[in-house]
Amino acid sequence: MEATISAEIFRDLTAVADEAGLLRFGAVRLDDPRLDHSRAAFEAFIAAGHQGEMQFLAHTKTMREDTNLLLPGAQSALVGVMAYAGESSAVARYAQWADYHTIVHRRLELVAKRVRDLLPGGETKICVDTKPIPERAFAMLAGIGFQGKNGCLIVPGLGSYVVIGTILTTGALAFDPASESRPRTSPPTARPWDACGSCRAWLDD
């Protein structure tokens, strides 16, 4: 019998995420056809050689396209974000912080444990910038934010100084994620950065 995540269960998970310190939380089906745009964009990026010396991007392309290679039977992605602080300097703000991989992973584990408690037989896989998944696309489709002109995920109310954490799960969403994910932003388009309007802060600052 397939494990399913109902709207009621998702609200329970959202409460756990809130208590764990995740400032935004949403969900997306892994078979959402809108993910095709992200996959096509990544294919074009690799084909053009834009990865430069980051050859691992090309080497993990197949895994990025098929999350079943990371978690067999994966049906959904639960996405959470945390904001980080720091001073403006030559060192990136996220690098001034404690290791976000560990911090976000620990908080996601609280949610993942709840998933496993509520879905007998359900499995989870936590990804915090260490697994080849389209986490930014997941976050956008989950209604958490949009892709800015700077290429980063921009979360209304938090900006782009956020880190994304994802829980892949074999639990299938039995509700419309758009009705439950909060706060909700507009669905991504082929030009998601249009939401930036005429803003050039990423270039001018």
Residue ranges with predicted function:
Residues 32, 195-205:
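Iron-sulfur cluster-binding cysteine motifs and their immediate structural context
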